[in-house]
Amino acid sequence: MTNNKWQRSMYDHLFASKTIGSKAWAIKAEKEADFLVEALNLSPGAKILDLPCGTGRHSLQFARYAFSVTGVDISQSCIDIAKKQSRHKNVKYQIGDMSALQRFKSKFDAVTNLFTSFGYFSTDQENKAVLRGMVQCLKPGGKIVINTINRNFLLGVYKPALWTIDRDTITVQASIFDVKTKYNESYVCIVNEKTGVGTARYHRVRLYSPDEMLRLMKQCGCTKVKVWGDFDGRPLNKKSSTHPIYIGQKA
């Protein structure tokens, strides 16, 4: 598999503090976890693999339900934050690559892949192999969750350049979408106005339409795939749903 070193540092402390590590996103994660727990219908003590786990915001929420949670992420920075925030004995974090999951084969009742965390490898073949590897982490009958941005929606509102100001932070982003490969490349810069400290990151992800994602999940060993339009439980709208939730069962 292609070694995308940029993934390891994509969410450093500054990026994480404004997104996945922020208080607002922690509150959002609680709502999302509540929805998933009901949709997955897992038994008490079920084993969940949160992949990638980022700063552990969903892992912590799953732990509230007394599930045994393993959070895996390629970013040392994110894992460090997750461990500091951990309040539950039934959550364990470790460094790991989504393309190397053999040690987890058939060990989990559920695998969660949230916040558009799928599609980061260089080719469709590699991404497909990663999804198949996640499915193989499941016990027979286990369930996988994919929550990713809807390409149909994004292209309808696509902006190649944008910038935002949030209190003392300026964010500038430039993006390019390749209509042939369906990959979106972004260059993001975040600067703190007060301190002058800034960081820049490169981001490349394969975007999928709902039809593509459904087909891919079935090709990778999923059956009985259900789709929701959002974490409020609305039905999927193939054009306007922003981040659909796909739940499939291992055959």
Predicted ranges, named:
Residues M1-A46:
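Conserved class I S-adenosyl-L-methionine
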Residues P52-G56:
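Class I SAM-dependent methyltransferase "Motif I" SAM/SAH-binding loop
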Residues Q102-A110:
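A short acidic, Gly/Pro-enriched loop at the edge of an enzyme's catalytic core
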Residues D109-Q125:
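A short SAM/SAH-binding and catalytic strip from SAM-dependent methyltransferases
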Residues V145-L216:
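SAM-dependent methyltransferase
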Residues P210-A251:
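C-terminal lobe and adjacent flexible extensions of AdoMet/dcAdoMet transferase-like proteins
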